[in-house]
Amino acid sequence: MFQDNPLLAQLKQQLHSQTPRAEGVVKATEKGFGFLEVDAQKSYFIPPPQMKKVMHGDRIIAVIHSEKDRESAEPEELVEPFLTRFVGKVQGKNDRLSIVPDHPLLKDAIPCRAARGVDHQFKEGDWAVAEMRRHPLKGDRSFYAELTQFITFGDDHFVPWWVTLARHNLEREAPNGVATEMLDEGLVRQDLTALNFVTIDSASTEDMDDALYAEALPDGKLQLTVAIADPTAWIAEGSKLDNVAKIRAFTNYLPGFNIPMLPRELSDDLCSLRAFEVRPALACRMTIAADGTIEDDIEFFAATIESKAKLVYDEVSDWLENSGNWQPENDAIAEQIRLLAQICQRRGEWRHNHALVFKDRPDYRFILGEKGEVLDIVAEPRRIANRIVEEAMIAANICAARVLRDKIGFGIYNVHMGFDPANADALAALLKTHGLHVDAQEVLTLEGFCKLRRELDAQPSGFLDSRIRRFQSFAEISTQPGPHFGLGLEAYATWTSPIRKYGDMINHRLLKAAIKGETASRPQDETTVQMTERRRLNRMAERDVGDWLYARFLKDKAGTDTRFAAEIIDISRGGMRVRLVDNGAVAFIPAPFLHAVRDELVCSQENGTVQIKGETVYKVTDVIDVTIAEVRMETRSIIARPVA
């Protein structure tokens, strides 16, 4: 009687359209229930039985039910699943496999089986890549996944590296391939093998891509020649090796080892500017005035060089600071170091006065044993030798930016536009509350940005600087010349690391076209998109491996009285994030550890402060003493507690 009844169908349709619905993202909790977060202000409770249909992070549409003034969400439609491809740990029970995703908020095992063509016999503890195949909101009875790749066994000491690389879908090994002979590029190479070029790197560096030679001119000016390794002399554009480098975009530097962009035969040997080996190079000669200005007589040319010394940062720094036992091999090398230090001094002063200089932050180096165990983590401050190389490279990149802009019209540029114009008024208002008066329009210009940065650098603490960071735009890779506000420069194009950056290889080819007086074709936008994406993935991989190693390193300090100095780097509603000064580890301090009475505590991300009973007790950039309360290995998170 009711079958195909149009009135009944209409009533159903009406009920459906009148039932309130909301779209949002599922947030799971450790208690079994969850929330549908619609926006920053509004969320709906999802009861435990309904949570079985969804996963943390799923974007869904849900029906909203109201009972006794309480609203709850019933998941109805999947908009976008949180999990598609993921990594996890396999569990095996009675020949039935399941996989637990490697994610802090995903605890449930998902039934799975190996995909066709994967011949590994999976067992308990194995790490694998999986892809979701079924979801309850797609009409399936349950969640289900397929194992598409075996990563490694559970007892492999190098799990942090292999799992992280698989998670971000990055290569594990150096590319294959070899270059047998140099290309005929129609370039005349200047023979500079007699000059005393030197390289300055870490003791363990094999891929040396820059060598320096300095000369004092009679008029008190200094001449600097920067010679850069020349992989494009071996790798033809569009060749198999070139395409591999284009995809990888960068050498991936992880704690303990790197995965090069080019085959090791090239990166660590044929192209590496090894001491006493004759190598092709692309070179730039510039004149530096007494005040550090780079004069207009910039010259780029192809060359052949022979490095006369592989110098090490710490040894050179010690020698310049009159400490340690190391001595340069001969007077010629000593003279080079002295002249390079003078150039560094001049360029540093010029950048301080006319551009911007980054604050020195130490690099943290993991010292690992043969089984990947963390023996120590050392802070390596940026010393004079590091600054010598940095100033030479920045000067060379400024030269390339000018030459490419004037002779070619494009290149691979690092562009940073400073503050987002949409944030200018809010920025000016915030600065005003702290006694700094800026014009909202002026601060959007390079000059205005530099002026503000110098004022911020003169502040007694970095607190205000940390507050305005959220108003800044991101640096971009662009084919169009543009300013780099972060460096305080009108244009910046890197070409000094072609062994490890594909963008620098592109700039080499464009600079060679300029040397020969030829025209060149503009790099495609897809190339800059790929480079930006790879840079993001490599940084995430470095962070993920680091988090894992920090957790391993600090595990035995959990629950002890060992104190660590820690800088507050972020404050949120739930607590504070701090960075341990001695080793760089990031830890979280939950709000209850700051003050027991929740109503008396205000943690404000907006203001970067923690207030207790209305009084500011902590703020971002403060350095406090903490102990390690807990290390959770499964999520690689470190929980700290302030020392009372």
UniProtKB/Swiss-Prot annotation:
GO cellular component: cytosol
Ranges where the RNB domain occurs: 189-516
Entry's EC annotation: 3.1.13.1
Pfam families: OB_RNB, RNB, S1
Disulfide linkage: none
PROSITE patterns: RIBONUCLEASE_II
Keyword set includes Iron: no
InterPro entries, alphabetized: CSD, NA-bd_OB-fold, RNase_B_OB_dom, RNase_II, RNase_II/R, RNase_II/R_CS, RNase_II/RNase_R, RNR_Ribonuclease
UniProt-annotated location(s): Cytoplasm
Example of a GO biological process term: mRNA catabolic process
Catalytic activity: Exonucleolytic cleavage in the 3'- to 5'-direction to yield nucleoside 5'-phosphates
The protein's name: Exoribonuclease 2
